[in-house]
Amino acid sequence: MYDAFTRVVSQRDARGEFLSSAQIDALSKLVSDSNKRIDTVNRITGNASAIVTNAARSLFAEQPQLIAPGGNAYTSRRMAACLRDMEIILRYVTYAIFAGDASVLEDRCLNGLRETYLALGTPGSSVAVGVQKMKDEALAIANDTNGITLGDCSALMAEVATYFDRAAAAVA
């Protein structure tokens, strides 16, 4: 996992080049937006249980066959595994938000996840819907302007959305 700084410096160092003005400007913007990023991660982390629970409730309301006898989330053990997986995906999304880089999400969470679900007979499309529902919950919480650093957060929220979209696409 590389943060944005390490990634840029490593690339330039490998080429034997100085940082460009555009790269310095982009990294400076990242620093100036760091409080917004921290606020976003804190909000999502502080509400992780509610995000997962609400997303799961919504998913199971839309797809009741998942919790019916024979469904992939039927029995408390399978339900717990489903909620655990959703929580793990959410946790890695917060790591990506904090780092400003999706590599930790890709490398440590999503790599091979679709194959695992296929092997277990878990419908990837349902997992993807659950991830999208977590995205909706997380963005609603992160976009609440009460008690956070002021300023335009639209770019950060778009970035946050892409991490959830990557996760959903990886399992679909």
Curated annotation (Swiss-Prot):
Signal sequence segment: none
Post-translational changes noted in the entry: Contains two covalently linked bilin chromophores.
Keywords for the protein's UniProt record, in alphabetical order: Antenna complex, Bile pigment, Chromophore, Electron transport, Membrane, Methylation, Photosynthesis, Phycobilisome, Thylakoid, Transport
Pfam families: Phycobilisome
Residues annotated with N4-methylasparagine modification: N72
Residues reported to bind (2R,3E)-phycocyanobilin 1: C82
Listed GO CC annotations: phycobilisome; plasma membrane-derived thylakoid membrane
Domain of life: Bacteria
Family membership: Belongs to the phycobiliprotein family.
General function of this protein: Light-harvesting photosynthetic bile pigment-protein from the phycobiliprotein complex (phycobilisome, PBS). Phycocyanin is the major phycobiliprotein in the PBS rod.
Entry protein name: C-phycocyanin beta subunit
Annotated organism of origin: Synechocystis sp. (strain PCC 6701)
